[in-house]
Amino acid sequence: MLNLDTNIVIEGLTGGLTNHEIALLESESIAISDIVLWEISKLIQLQRISLDLESTEFRRMLAQLTVYPITAEIARQSTALDFRSDPADEIIAATSVVEKIPLLTRDRKILNSKIVPLAK
């Protein structure tokens, strides 16, 4: 299983994934933190991306995912990471730590972490 950062979900929906990212996604089941859905909604609201959350494509993608809720353990872990970022990124990274699943991300701060399990 792979946990996806928001940037990977958006690139997947807009056709911007690399061949390596596509290969990883095709070989694993997929999960996201529930805060990814909030981040996507905010980016749409701010007109930074153009996606339709009601589209058949988005609903189909969502039905194939495991969505992890923010738990007390994930919230605690988000404060014990070896990097500082925006709260959503910290929750996403902490989800990977707590659930012990690699995170697929392009975020440089997270990629430099020694704590967060990363997709290779």
Where are these regions (language model features)?
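Short, well-structured N-terminal submotif of metal-dependent ribonuclease cores
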Residues: M1-I32, I44-R59
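Acidic catalytic patch
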Residues: E57-D82
